[in-house]
Structures are given as structure tokens and as C-alpha cells.
Amino acid sequence: MKDSVLDEVRHRGSAVIRDVLPRQSALDLKKQAQGYIAANPGVKAFPPDDPTVYELYWSPSQTAARAHPNMLLTQRFLASLWHSSDSRSEMSTTYPLTYADRLRIRRPGDGKFALGPHTDGGSLERWEDPEYAKVYQRILDGEWEEYDPMDARHRINARMDLYDSPGGCSAFRLFQGWLSMSSTGPGEGTLQLCPLLKHATAYLILRPFFDSTSGSLNLDSSFPGSVPGAGQEYNPETHPHLELESSMVSVPHVEPGDFVAWHCDTIHSVDKQHMGRGDASVLYIPACAMTPPNVEFIKQQRMAALAYSPPQDFPGAGGPGEVGFHGAVDWGKVPGDGLRAMGLGSSGWEKSPNMSEGEVSVIEKANRVLFPSVSA
């Protein structure tokens, strides 16, 4: 791929990757998911009166998509767009880890599943947590042009959920993303993004320190759109200069098997109304680097997987979840590399001579934590 294309992805903070899975394979995954839901009436979903997002994490469809070789390659590619300004940073982009999330089947006409412009990864934490704040230090120093959104150095150990928020994420996700299982275009219940990553982030970080009307310095305790225990929200009143009415851009038309990814700081929203004729269905699959905190997260998530229980970031964590469900995934049939990315299986990760000091260190730690019998 040309460097100019890679630079554009880094600049915009988002990408559509075509044909990650064959079209028919993606459609088969949707059909399988629908069958799994129908076979298990106890599945929880919201909104409860017209389900759109299903509280499923270990269905055969989700597990197969996460473990697919093309999906692992896609995550590795997305991770490779990142770097650390410190070679000692304990992060591996060679071996991304798998974060289990939910699935969405949004029906035509739906207007209930509407998420306004927001950014995940906490809100006040960006200023409050000392390590997280260092991510944006160049912006706070008045040198926003020098800020590098793809530098993971201070994100690795940042605390992005200081308030145990119900929608918080305990893992460091380089990119959020989903795999399309539908033919869906703009206005058809899909995603909108603000493709001005560096500019929008600089505005967000500096916004609490000036009056939006006069532009004068404002050092009171207000942080517009930031509420403890919630993600960062945006609207024309709190962040008027973002001009959200025009700066939020719909994701291009996608087909089953296409993958959409957006940077962890990207402002995103969902169409208020699904104006299409077919369902807008996706499997949420982010790209996560191997870092010490993420390894510890995977260790806990692995326990949830084997118990068919919701992972620690989601409602009902530790509860019965999908225990006893008809058609539950058989872990013995999941490919080895896919299992390993979930901290399962029996083989650890290999080191290579060209890896940085930090990458070697985190791989050794991951093997000790997740595969102690192999690393011993």
C-alpha cells in the first residue's frame, strides 16, 4: 500500500477496508447469529421492546469472525499504523489481542438506537489522569500541530475509566471497528465520523479553557460535554466551533464483509433514523494492541469466555450470560491463532530479532501471564 494512503488514514483517523471476509461468509454469519438469537429466547437486548443491540459475546458468529485469519491480519495492519516515541514502551503491534464486544441488527425505520456525537475512552479522564493527560501534552503546551495521535507511549498505562462507568472500556483500543453483515449506505442506520482527528482532538482538549462566545480565557471548573462515568459528548452548544452539522461525515456504502475502523479519539455518532430498506447489521470488533494492562484484561476476559459469561466491561459481567444456550460455540473448533489472541489455546507468542526492547518485554510478560506452562 502506498505511503500516501497510510498517511491519509492516520490523518483522517478512519478507514473502510473492503472484503475482509467474503460477502457470502459475512451473510452466513448474520444468518447464524439470527438463528442463535431465535434458538435462545433468553437473549438480552436493547431497546427491550425493539431489539437492536444484543448482549451476546460468545456466539459462534462473533467468535468465528474474531478468529478469522483475515480479521487478525486486518487488526495487525491497523495496529501497525501506530508507534511509540519510546522504544522501551511495552506494546506489540505484531500480535493484537481480541476484545469481545456485542452485535447489532438494526431494522429499517428504527429511530431508537441513536447515538449522538461522542468519543469513547472516558471524558474527564483525559485531563484528570496524569498519564492520560500526557497523551495531549503538546496540545496543552500550545503546540497542537506537533501532536501525534498515533503515538501510543502514554496511552498504554493511561486510566481511561476512573469512575467505573457502565459504558466504559477497560482495554486500550487502538481503533474501534465493526464488520458489516449488510449492504448499507449513508442514512441507513450506519455510522458518522468527524474525519479531522488532530484538529478535533486539539479543540476538545483546549475547549474547557476558553469561553466559546468571546474566546476569552476561562479557568472555571466546567468541562463541556464531560460527565464523570460517561464518554465525552459533543453538541453545537458545548463545542460550537466543530460545526458538527457539517463536519460529521457518513461512512461510505459498505457491503457484507467490509470492515470500518476509527481511531480511539475519533468523534462518531449513529444515524438518528434508519431510512434504508434492509437491516444494518454489524459485529463490533476493535483492534487492541498487546500491552501489560491489555494482557491482564484478556486474562479476565478468558475466564468469562470459558464460562460463557459477559466480559468485565459489560452488563451482567460474571453472570450466567450464554450458559446453556443452544448452539453455543465449541472452543475446540476455533482456529489456533484466533484462540491465542483471546488468551486461549496452548501456544504462546514468538519473539523476533527486529523487535524493540519494549515489544520483547511485553511478549515475555504475556506468555508468562497467559501461557505459563509454555513460557516456563
Model-predicted segments: where are they?
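Fe(II)/2-oxoglutarate
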Residues: 1-11, 332, 344-345, 349-376
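Long, charged, low-complexity terminal extensions
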Residues: 311-346, 352, 375-376
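A short hydrophobic beta-strand segment most commonly corresponding to one strand
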Residues: 277-292
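Non-heme Fe(II) oxygenase catalytic core, chiefly the N-lobe of the double-stranded beta-helix
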Residues: 4, 9-12, 24-238, 245-252, ...
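Double-stranded beta-helix
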Residues: 288-317
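Short, charged beta-turn/beta-strand-edge "cap" motif at the junction between a beta-strand
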Residues: 262-268
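Hydrophobic beta-strand signal
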Residues: 16, 261-262, 284
